């Protein structure tokens, strides 16, 4: 009887944990999440959220499911020396727990829109 209860509990836990979903997209200023999807976590994996910053300015976020090939490893202030970007990665294991990321920086949105307007004027001449 105990073995049957243990087996039932194990199957139930596997079924519940197998249905955990994560957000999956690249979030950029002004546009928000690009190609928003949902991914299903594999057993033993976690949702990942990586935020990239240039100095203190948020540049983009990458939301995804961890995989056996790329398991979630929390890291703070990892720097890419070539690009000068700083990355912060967080992990979580609840349904849709990796949020869509920080709000866009207003100054960056203004720079982006001004650049688009300038490009449009240049193309018209």
UniProtKB/Swiss-Prot annotation:
Presence of the UniProt keyword Cell membrane in the record: yes
Keyword list, A-Z: Cell membrane, Disulfide bond, Glycoprotein, GPI-anchor, Lipoprotein, Membrane, Signal
Tissue expression profile of the protein: Highly expressed at the leading edges of cells, on filopodia.
Disulfide-bonded cysteines: 22-47, 25-33, 39-65, 92-97
Glycosylation sites: 88
Domain (UPAR/Ly6): residue spans on this chain: 20-111
GO cellular component: extracellular region; plasma membrane; protein-containing complex; side of membrane
The protein's name: Lymphocyte antigen 6 complex locus protein G6c
Phylogenetic classification of the source organism: Eukaryota, Metazoa, Chordata, Craniata, Vertebrata
């Amino acid at each position: 009887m105990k073995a049957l209860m243990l087996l039932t509990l194990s199957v139930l836990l596997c079924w519940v944990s197998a249905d955990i979903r994560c957000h999956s997209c690249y979030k950029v200023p002004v546009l928000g999440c690009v190609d928003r999807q949902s991914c299903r976590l594999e057993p033993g994996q976690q949702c990942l959220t990586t935020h990239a910053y240039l100095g203190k300015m948020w540049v983009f976020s990458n939301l995804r499911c961890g995989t056996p090939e790329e398991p979630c490893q929390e890291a703070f202030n990892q720097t890419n020396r070539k690009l000068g970007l700083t990355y912060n990665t967080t992990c979580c294991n609840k349904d849709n727990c990796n949020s869509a990321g920080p709000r866009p920086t207003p100054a960056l949105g203004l720079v982006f829109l001004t650049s688009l307007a300038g490009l449009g004027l240049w193309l018209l001449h």
